[in-house]
Amino acid sequence: RHSVEQIITAYGMARELGFDNINMDLIIGLPKETSEDVRATMEEVKKLGPDSITVHSLAIKRASRLHLLWEEYKDQTGRDIDAMAEVTANTAREMGLEPYYLYRQKNMAGNFENVGYAAPGKACIYNILIMEELQTIAACGAGTTTKLIFPAENRKERVENVKDADQYVERIDEMLERKEKMLTIQPLTAGKKAQS
């Protein structure tokens, strides 16, 4: 967990260090959240002035605590999601940010989508490549997933790290070995050529 103050401090430090393309991610449709809550959040975001924002409609993951407590929260989640999405789109426009990518996930609040907004020239190519699954990604840390893309074979391979941070630290050698093995895998076509 982090606080609003920690976000503001981290953002300020990043700017002081010279970062000139900062994205902020927001989740809308949280339990008990209203469009007025989202409006207040967006006003704070506007004060900071990030170069891009990504607005995620809440997607309930199967392994999440919210999924386990769904019966308790289902009537309080995403009730006003269309108004929330409108608030974020309008504020992004006021900030001079334009939509540059959109993607959907399973189990999204209100059956909405995630939208990336960016200032001209500040679109995050990484986000586009990730969503289109066009780029190999080597991920580090607990709960992350490395994904290898083999475009010539229309094939993707994934290696997930353990989610628990303590387990990740205890098993770091295993995690590194799995990743190294995956990153040195030759495409299937290379193996077929060698056999011919």
Predicted regions and their residues:
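Conserved non-cysteine loop/helix-boundary elements of the Radical SAM core domain that shape
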Residues: 1-88
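Short glycine-aromatic motifs
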Residues: 94-97
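Radical SAM enzyme core and accessory elements
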Residues: 116-196
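Short alpha-helical functional segments enriched in proximate histidine and acidic residues
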Residues: 91
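Asparagine-centered polar/low-complexity signal
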Residues: 21-23, 114, 127
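Flexible glycine/acidic-rich beta-alpha junction loops that bind and position SAM and/or redox cofactors
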Residues: 28-35, 50-77, 99-124, 139-152
